[in-house]
Each structure stands twice: as C-alpha cells, then as structure tokens.
Design a protein with these regions (language model features):
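C-terminal structural segments of small proteins and small subunits
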Residues: 53-87
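Residue-level signal for inorganic ion chemistry
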Residues: 5, 45, 56
Length: 87
C-alpha cells in the first residue's frame, strides 16, 4: 500500500495526528538530523501497521517532510482497515 505522509519532527511522542484522505500527519520524536526522523518514522509506522520495519520503505521525499511511503508485509485489505480507523 502506498501512503502519503506529512512528518512533524521533534514532537514529545510518536503519534498519528490525523488522516486527510490518504495523507497521514505523523509526529515523531526524532529531529531532522542524519536520517533520524526517517528511521523513527519507519519504526513507528511498522509498529502502527503491525509489520516488520523492513516492510516500510520511503520511496519519495526522504529529505523533506512530505513523503511517499510503501508499506508491505500485510494484506492490502488489513492495511486499509488500519488506515480507515484513523480519525
């Protein structure tokens, strides 16, 4: 499943803030230095969607806050249900 993500770094905790259509707004505790935010995002999304960290790949936007992320490791239907549960 392909997901658009807007990352908010330096947050007090990792959390999915909201979903607007297929775009997730995600806060991560890591800063923007040396891939820290990308690694934190991968780890958090893996936990959130219940997949292995290697199943979360940033395919576009690795150096910006707007990212396109591919999530594999679960059936598309299961991942879509998780997405739809986000307010």
């Amino acid at each position: 499943m392909i997901v658009k993500v807007r990352v908010i770094p330096n947050a007090p905790e990792n959390e999915v803030v909201s979903r607007i259509g297929s775009v997730l707004r995600v806060k991560v505790t890591a800063g923007e230095v040396n891939e820290e935010a990308n690694n934190a995002l991968r780890g958090y999304l893996a936990e959130f969607f219940e997949v292995a960290p290697r199943a979360v790949n940033i395919i576009r936007g690795a150096k910006g806050r707007e990212k396109t992320v591919e999530i594999t490791g679960q059936p598309e239907e299961s991942l879509r249900r998780v997405m739809e549960s986000i307010p």
